[in-house]
Amino acid sequence: VSREVPVSVYETDITEWKKHGELAAFLKETGYTHVEFHPVMEYLDQNSGGYSTSSYFALTNRFGTPADFRALVEELHQEGIGVILDWTPAQFPRFDAGLEKFDGTPLYEVQDPAMAVHPMWGTMLYNYGSPMVKDFLLSNAFFWLDEFHVDGFRLDDVDAMLYLDFGREAGQWRPNLYGSNENLQAVEFLKHLNSIVKKRNPGVLLIAQEDGLWPQLTDSVENDHLGFDYKWSGGWTKDLLSYIEVEPLERKDYYDQLTLSMMYAYSEHYVLTLGRRDVGTLKEFLEKLPGSPKQKLAQVRAAYAYLMLHPGVKMTAPDKECTEEMKAYIHDLNAMYRSCPALYAMDGNSDGFEWIQFTNYDENIVAFLRKTEKMEETLLIVCNFSPVSYDSYQVGVPFAGKYKEIFNSDNGKYGGLGVVNTRAKNAVHAECDNRENSLKMKLPAYGVTVFSCTPEKKVSSVKRVGKKVKISRK
């Protein structure tokens, strides 16, 4: 799949959508490109949320029939929405009718009893060195691709596959033949999985949920790496939440959490998430934030906007029962993301991002540019995470020209206070942020504003010199 296209994923549990056409209508109204379903394979443990798969080739009976699910996928495809499934090839549950000692011997699980059971979850770990196990998991991936025409997988707990010591204390694990903690058999399985899926089903998205800092996980198999398309950026989510959940007066001490992600943003191709597993429902997200109800909502809008404007693929999960104002907000964020190449075309290239303000600790403001190779597609973005509103906030700009606000999270139609910039502004020749030109704008409290940038047209000196002058001979 090309990484130069916008990808905005809606995370949800399929049980929340019971009426025909309801999910497709919601996704179309809010502007998402993809939906990611929590596991749809059969499971027994209700408390697992589906992540303890018991029958890999069966749709859970909680969701209706296979024909129903197939029809749902087709309905979403007709609206141009891709379908991604959460998939659990890292471990399987222990129960009498399951895969554990399927024929009386350790057939699917790791042969070594000390390494077969994961101490954190009490589940069994697959033996990726077994050709039968590899074929079982590969055939399962192709089953969902071929039978239901899904468009990708998010692999859960990839770090439990890659690291022999994941979640284990010293003495609870055995090193590989080189004396290190990498599961070499799992590494080869993932390389094979990613390469064969992409060869057989071009365009399928393969996303890894991995927090163990495996190097270059999204680099190609040809370069001897794992070949995933994207990796969840758990660090980005953790850093942002650790910043916005503290009281505004204390945020200056956590300001670096806002900017830290750009130190590693181009080491992988990331998915940025503010989903159910990160913040819970919208109500639960609001409860985590300081301030009045209005201020809490403003901060949620600012967090969503910061995610959408930061380099990386997007994944959010606003409630299906969210207000019309929030629906309009998500729609406009997605519409801007999809229509502005600067927000996606150079996601994997550091030339597509440039800081303007990233040391405003006391003000809790960051400003940056998103760019393409075309100067006229540049976007100026200013994010204010403080309760202070500004009537004339100055920021340095990349060049002389006209700047027009195309998005403001404080717009009244989103439930904001309406601190917006209604007229286009011309940059002035006044130094700011070590730049020759600057701009003064209204900047709302807990607000994010985005300006399009039109360079000043310069009159060609060649044309002036070559201008014909009519000389009077009188």
Give the predicted meaning of each segment.
Residues 1, 79, 98-111, 246-262, ...:
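Core domains of carbohydrate- and sulfate-ester-processing enzymes
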Residues 9-11, 84, 154, 207-208, ...:
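Generic enzyme active-site microenvironment
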Residues 18-19, 65-68, 132-137, 182-189, ...:
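Soluble or luminal CAZymes and related metallo-dependent hydrolases
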Residues 149-151, 166-318, 338-410, 417-418:
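Conserved alpha/beta catalytic core and glycan-binding cleft of carbohydrate-active enzymes
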